[in-house]
Regions:
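Bacterial N-terminal signal peptides that target proteins for export
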Residues: 2-10
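Signal peptide-directed extracytoplasmic domains
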Residues: 86-124
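Flexible, glycine-rich surface segments
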Residues: 161-221
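Internal, conserved structured core segments that host functional sites
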Residues: 111-176
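Start-of-domain marker
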Residues: 24-91, 102-104
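Sec/Tat signal peptide C-region and signal peptidase I cleavage site
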Residues: 19-23
Length: 221
């Protein structure tokens, strides 16, 4: 099912993403809120926002969902920086929302909004991120929400099409709960299971977009 919500900017997408056409995300806008962080510590995060954007844009989270073309805004609120030996630990909150390009070129907020609290991860300036299925606090956190977005999007393309991706998010949160960085992961585990099990809402989303596509097809004809 090809939703008309993407058709208006498909040509621009092709020009923008080039060699990264296999990724699920075509635009990611990451913003850091550093107001609670001291001036001395802020320099640690010079590249973090761009690194997060590049991670989403350049990672193939699934080989079978290459044409989703999602746009996401991420706001990461850094709450504290603590030192323990040679390790720097970050505590944060985050908001993830999906967006859609309008005919006038502006971005409109869509239907997915995720608020994450209790984020904790080790970090060092300039640290690069690479996809892995092994639990890694920051990368696994980003993977979790990538799969949540993919799952909810796939539910609009195919009936219960996001189930396997909800399962991926649940698996990540299982690893997080059992790790040395378990803060917040129980909440994320509950969230992914709750959304996955809400078959009424998931079927409603699929039927809405199915009807929407049928209506658009009639308008085109």
């Amino acid at each position: 099912m090809i939703h008309h919500k993407y058709l208006n900017f498909s040509t621009a997408i092709f020009l923008l993403i080039g060699s990264f056409s296999w990724a699920q995300f075509i635009e990611v806008n990451a913003e850091l809120d550093l107001r609670r962080i001291s001036e001395g510590d802020r320099q640690i995060f010079i590249t973090l926002a761009k690194d997060i954007e590049n991670y989403f844009l350049n990672t193939q989270f699934s080989a079978i969902t290459n044409d989703l073309e999602m746009i996401v805004d991420i706001r990461l609120v850094l709450e504290s920086v603590s030192q323990g030996g040679s390790q720097t630990t970050i505590n944060a909150q985050a908001i993830f929302v999906n967006k859609q390009v309008q005919p006038d070129g502006n971005l409109k907020t869509l239907d997915q909004y995720f608020y994450a609290k209790g984020i904790q991860f080790p970090y060092s300036q300039g640290r690069k991120m690479f996809y892995t299925t092994v639990f890694e606090p920051l990368v696994s956190f980003l993977n979790y929400y990538a799969f949540m977005f993919i799952a909810t999007e796939m539910d609009t393309w195919e009936y219960m099409g996001g189930t396997s991706f909800f399962n991926r998010a649940i698996e990540i949160s299982d690893l997080g709960k059992d790790s040395d960085w378990s803060t917040g992961w129980d909440d994320r585990w509950k969230k992914s299971r709750k959304v996955k099990s809400n078959q009424y809402l998931r079927s409603m989303r699929f039927n809405y977009f199915k009807a929407w596509d049928a209506l658009y097809a009639e308008d085109v004809d």
